[in-house]
Regions:
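Core catalytic region of metal-dependent phosphoesterases/phosphodiesterases
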Residues: 6-89, 184-187
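Beta-strand-turn-beta hairpins that frame and shape the catalytic cleft
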Residues: 1-4, 87-96, 129, 174-181, ...
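Histidine-centered divalent metal-coordination motifs
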Residues: 10, 62-63, 133, 160-167
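Conserved beta-sheet core of the metallophosphoesterase superfamily
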Residues: 50, 55-57, 74, 138-193
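Short glycine-/acidic-enriched loop or helix-start segments at secondary-structure transitions
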Residues: 15-16, 40-42, 68-70, 105-106, ...
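Structural motif
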Residues: 3-5, 29-32, 96, 129-133, ...
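Residue-level detector of structured alpha->beta connecting loops
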Residues: 27, 53, 125-126, 157
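Conserved catalytic scaffold of divalent metal-dependent phosphoesterases
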Residues: 11, 64-152
Length: 193
């Protein structure tokens, strides 16, 4: 399975158009948050993604809420918003958790505490692909990642952790044991599963 994954487009329609083009050769597409910029421009930014013919999995970032993302994609046939939920595609589980984890200093930000995230991550299936807007603590995070994401990925032997949020770490990779951790960025990353 060929997965195209990205994060943090922040209303960049040129990046979105490039991702739609790249998606023509993908079996599944995953966007792990921050489609909007401080809750503005969400609908215009995600609208082009409706043209993608493969299944599309979207996770909210800290710049949009899960409810806003669900509303913006309501009625789309191939799009699933994941926030504390799992989608199975061709025998592979994908679990999504969005928002800033731990909480950020910005009053506009969609965030989760470490405890809220840990409670949500209890549902992470064994060996799933973990789509988390926030990176795991100590991995592609500049020291700002989530302990809950780290523990869940390690304990459930995640197949991969695909994240974003920390822009200075885009395209960087790390490992939690055998688990690939990749901070994606807006250019698109292809992973064979």
């Amino acid at each position: 399975m060929k997965l195209l994954a990205f994060s943090d487009v922040h209303c960049d329609l040129g990046a979105v158009e490039s991702l739609v083009e790249q998606a023509r050769s993908a079996d599944v597409v995953a966007g792990v948050g921050d489609f909007a910029s401080i809750h503005e421009g969400l609908l215009q930014t995600v609208a082009p993604l409706a043209a993608i013919e493969a299944p599309v999995l979207l996770v909210p970032g800290n710049n949009e809420t899960a409810d806003a993302l669900r509303s913006a994609t309501a009625g789309w046939d191939r799009v699933t918003v994941l926030h504390g939920e799992t989608a199975a595609i061709d025998g592979i589980d994908f679990f999504g958790i969005g928002g800033g984890i731990p909480t950020t200093p910005w009053d506009w930000s969609f965030d989760l505490t470490e405890d809220e995230a840990a409670n949500m991550l209890v549902a992470l299936p064994e060996s799933a692909v973990l789509l988390s807007h926030s990176p795991p603590k100590g991995h592609v995070d500049k020291g700002l990642g989530s302990s809950a994401v780290l523990e869940a990925a390690r304990d459930k032997h995640a197949r991969a952790v695909l994240c974003g949020h920390i822009h200075e770490q885009w395209t960087n990779e790390s490992r939690i044991g055998d688990t690939l951790v990749r901070n994606l960025g807006p250019d698109g990353y292809v992973l064979e599963l």
